Regions:
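Aromatic- and carboxylate-enriched substrate-binding clefts and catalytic-loop regions
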Residues: 1-169, 204-205, 220
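Carbohydrate-binding surfaces of carbohydrate-active enzymes
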Residues: 61-62, 144-277
Length: 277
C-alpha cells in the first residue's frame, strides 16, 4: 500500500505516471479505487494524524497534473478539474434508477465533470456470462448516458447485443457526439461559475415540488431529459415545468403539465425549452 501522505511516495508515484506519459505518449489516467476504507484498521502513515479520507484526498490530487483523468473516489476536491464517476453499478434496473439522482448529487456537491459509471453496469464480472445479459437494460442505460457529461462503454455493444439493439446504442453515442459542443461549453462555464452541468428540476423551479423527481433532469439550462428506467416500459410520464417544450420527435408541450409520452425502445425522450435563460 502506498502512503501518499509521504512526499517521497507521492513524488515516486507521480514520476511513474510521468514516465508513461513521456515514454509511451499516454494521454491520461483512470484513477480507480483510492477509497478511505483501504486506510483503516490502525494503519500508521507518514502524516501521523491523517484520517482515512485524507489519503483519498492525496490520491485525488495526483490527477490534477493530468488534464485527462477520471476518479471514482475523491475527498474535498469539489470545483477542481477532476472527472468524477459514480461508484460501480451492477447490471440491474435498481442500479439504473440510481444514476440520475447520483449524478445530480455529485453536481450539487461541486463535482461538475461527472460520469454515470459504465453503460449496462460497471462491475467487472457483469458481462462474463453473455447468456444472462439483459439487452434492454444495456440499451436503456446507454440512453441515460447519452446526454450526460460523459458517456462510457465497458463491454463492446456489438459483442453482446443483437444487431438492432447495437444500432440503438450506436445512435445514442452519435447523439452524445451531436451534443458534444454544447456539453463542452457547459463544462467551460461550470469551471467559471461552479454550476452543475446536470441539474435537478428544482434548480430552476424551486417551489413546484420538483425536488422529489429522480427520473428526469435538466442538461444545462433548457434541455429536459427523461429516459425510461422501467423494464418493458414503452411509455412514461414526463413532468413539464412552465413554458413551451419541443421534443426530440417534434412534439410540443405547454407546461406546467404531466404528460404520458411514447417511448419505444429506440427512443430517448428529451425536450428543449423555447425560452433562453
Amino acid at each position: 500500500m502506498l502512503d501518499l501522505s509521504n512526499p517521497r511516495a507521492f513524488a515516486w508515484m507521480e514520476g511513474e505516471l510521468d514516465h508513461l506519459v513521456e515514454e509511451y505518449g499516454v494521454d491520461g489516467f483512470k484513477f480507480d479505487a483510492g477509497d478511505a476504507k483501504f486506510y483503516e484498521s490502525g494503519i500508521i502513515s507518514f502524516e501521523g494524524d491523517s484520517i482515512p479520507n485524507k489519503h483519498t484526498e492525496y490520491f485525488a490530487k495526483l490527477g490534477l497534473k493530468y488534464p485527462l483523468n477520471e476518479y471514482r473516489a475523491s475527498w474535498k476536491m469539489a470545483g477542481l478539474p477532476l472527472a468524477q464517476r459514480l461508484r460501480d453499478k451492477t447490471p440491474d434496473w435498481g442500479d439504473l434508477k440510481q444514476l440520475i439522482p447520483g449524478m445530480i448529487a455529485q453536481g450539487l456537491m461541486g463535482y461538475a465533470y461527472t460520469c454515470p459509471d459504465m453503460i449496462g453496469g460497471g462491475e467487472y464480472q457483469s458481462f462474463l456470462k453473455l447468456d444472462n445479459i439483459d439487452q434492454e437494460l444495456v440499451v436503456r442505460s446507454a440512453q441515460v448516458h447519452a446526454l450526460m457529461p460523459m458517456m462510457q462503454f465497458s463491454v463492446a455493444p456489438w459483442r453482446v447485443l443483437s444487431p438492432a439493439n447495437n444500432e440503438i446504442c450506436k445512435k445514442m453515442a452519435l447523439l452524445h457526439e451531436k451534443f458534444g459542443d454544447e456539453i463542452l461549453a457547459l463544462a467551460h462555464r461550470s469551471s467559471k461559475n461552479g454550476e452543475p452541468i446536470v441539474k435537478p428540476m428544482a434548480w430552476f423551479w424551486p417551489d413546484a415540488g420538483y425536488e422529489v423527481i429522480q427520473d428526469q433532469f435538466i442538461l444545462g439550462d433548457n434541455l429536459l431529459v427523461a429516459p425510461v428506467l422501467e423494464k418493458d416500459a414503452r411509455s412514461r410520464k414526463v413532468v413539464f415545468p412552465e413554458g413551451t417544450w419541443i421534443g426530440d420527435d417534434g412534439s410540443e408541450v405547454v407546461g406546467p403539465a404531466t404528460v404520458e409520452i411514447a417511448a419505444p425502445l429506440e427512443r430517448l425522450p428529451y425536450f428543449r425549452l423555447q425560452v433562453s435563460r
